[in-house]
């Protein structure tokens, strides 16, 4: 997926199966790999996968989570994740947040 923004209030996404609109929700599947390309927004809107809005970073299976240099996040969803409800969130703007459900 590739990110876009709606000011400092929302992320938008393009890519296979991406829902239009602000801060869309995602369903990610166990064992699948997802790449989020946030290179065009990394300076102003760094994206991080978290356990909850404002919570700690979710690190299991995630490489380059909140990479302030490349803006790329790769998430290999574990077969037995410790959490099945996660969020993606801008580390600078709390309103830029959406849900990730793991099935």
Which functions belong to the PLM regions below?
Residues 29-31, 70:
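Solvent-exposed, conformationally flexible loop/turn segments
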Residues 50-56:
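Short edge-strand/loop segments of extracellular domains
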Residues 18-21, 25-27:
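Surface-exposed ligand/attachment interfaces on beta-rich extracellular proteins
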Residues 1-8, 15-19, 41-44, 64-103:
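Extracellular/periplasmic metallocenter environments
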Residues 13, 36-38:
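Aromatic/hydrophobic beta-strand junction motif of beta-rich domains
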Residues 31, 39-41:
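Short solvent-exposed strand-capping/beta-turn motif centered on an Asx-Ser/Thr pair
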Residues 24, 32-34:
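Structural beta-strand segments of beta-rich domains
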Residues 35, 46-50:
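Beta-strand signatures of extracellular beta-sandwich domains
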């Amino acid at each position: 997926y590739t990110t876009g923004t709606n000011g400092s209030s929302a992320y938008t996404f393009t890519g296979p199966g991406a829902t239009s609109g602000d801060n869309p929700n995602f369903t990610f599947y166990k064992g699948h790999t997802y790449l989020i390309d946030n290179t065009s927004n990394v300076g102003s809107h760094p994206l991080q996968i978290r356990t909850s809005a404002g919570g700690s970073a979710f690190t299991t299976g995630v490489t380059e989570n909140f990479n302030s240099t490349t803006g790329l996040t790769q998430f290999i969803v574990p077969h037995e994740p410790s959490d099945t409800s996660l969020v993606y969130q801008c580390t600078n703007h709390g309103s830029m947040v959406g849900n990730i459900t793991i099935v």
